[in-house]
């Protein structure tokens, strides 16, 4: 259950970063990072 909470916090943090940048630059590394996070 701890992993779910961490994931929610991680996604919320990424959303804030995306809102700040508002560009496609973050999407590519963010997607790769999310896939890596999902494997665990």
UniProtKB/Swiss-Prot annotation:
GO terms for cellular component: extracellular region. Belongs to the ComC family. It is found in: Secreted. One of its GO terms (biological process) is establishment of competence for transformation. It comes from the Bacteria. Pfam families: ComC. It comes from Streptococcus mitis (strain B6). One of its GO terms (molecular function) is pheromone activity. This is Competence-stimulating peptide.
